[in-house]
């Protein structure tokens, strides 16, 4: 049985991705920065296992990857899903500590977890959850979008460095109905949906299906790609 680790796996895209892998018969581990959130999710699903670990904590990344390999004998796939956005506003005005936090979690975090997973013996693939914000700039989300643009480039760089042994791909969603993106749609869901050619927001399950495909053997000849899943947002 193969093993996957999903960072930030207690809600939204992360939780839906974890469930998708469970449905396909994988060993599934998740991380959460909050112990109470992790405990609540694990109590609802006996097939899930998890660790309390912040996305920007190198020691936690090292220990988590090692424990998973010790418990299961392998770590096959890493999903770098954990992200944050405490830094809304103009780059000229936004608090610099919030910008640093955004970049630490969204950019340094995936690098840390990928490095530690590889050191622990990662076998097959890495999947980075990027964003269309890393492709097209938008008002008031500069720090977040810069972090995702960096993650898109990092995906390609790591794909080159880790080939031929480990594949590295990414996905770039538009507005998905999650807690993290709530500020983008909660006050006017129809208006937000209308920004997409398909006139609807994404669901976490939509994204999870693409993540699973890119992580699976069905995508064994795909690496270095960042696939948009945006309902036509970029058209």
Positions of predicted regions on the chain:
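A glycine/serine/threonine-rich, flexible loop-to-helix segment
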Residues: 41, 170, 174-196
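C-terminal substrate-recognition "lid" of short-chain dehydrogenase/reductases
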Residues: 120, 200-229, 234
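Conserved glycine-rich cofactor-binding loop
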Residues: 10-11
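Catalytic Tyr-X3-Lys loop
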Residues: 92-111, 127, 144, 151
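Conserved mid-core segment of classical short-chain dehydrogenase/reductases
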Residues: 85-100, 140-143, 182-185
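Alpha-helical segment proximal to the catalytic Tyr-Lys
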Residues: 119, 159-164, 220
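Active-site helix of classical SDR
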Residues: 114, 147, 155
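Residue(s) in the substrate-gating loop at a strand-loop-helix junction
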Residues: 131
């Amino acid at each position: 049985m193969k093993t996957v680790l999903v960072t930030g796996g207690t809600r939204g895209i992360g939780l839906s991705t974890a469930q998708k892998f469970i449905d396909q018969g994988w060993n599934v581990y998740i991380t959460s920065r909050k112990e109470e959130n992790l405990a609540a999710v694990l109590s609802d699903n006996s097939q899930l296992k998890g660790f309390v670990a912040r996305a920007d904590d190198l020691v936690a990344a090292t220990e988590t990857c090692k424990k998973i390999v010790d418990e299961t004998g392998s770590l096959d796939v890493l999903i770098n899903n954990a992200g944050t956005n405490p830094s809304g506003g103009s780059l000229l005005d936004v608090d610099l500590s919030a910008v640093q936090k955004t970049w630490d979690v969204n950019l340094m975090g995936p690098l840390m977890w990928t490095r530690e997973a590889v050191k622990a013996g990662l076998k097959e693939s890495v999947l980075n959850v990027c964003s269309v914000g890393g492709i097209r700039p938008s008002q008031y989300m500069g720090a977040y979008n810069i972090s995702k643009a960096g993650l898109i480039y990092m995906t390609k760089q790591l794909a080159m460095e880790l080939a031929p042994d480990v594949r590295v791909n990414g996905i770039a969603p538009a507005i998905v109905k999650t807690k993290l993106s709530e500020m983008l749609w909660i006050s006017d869901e129809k208006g937000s949906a209308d920004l997409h050619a398909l006139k609807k927001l994404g669901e976490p399950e939509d994204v999870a299906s693409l993540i699973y495909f890119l992580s699976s053997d069905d995508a064994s000849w795909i690496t270095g790609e960042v696939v948009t899943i945006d309902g036509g947002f970029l058209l």
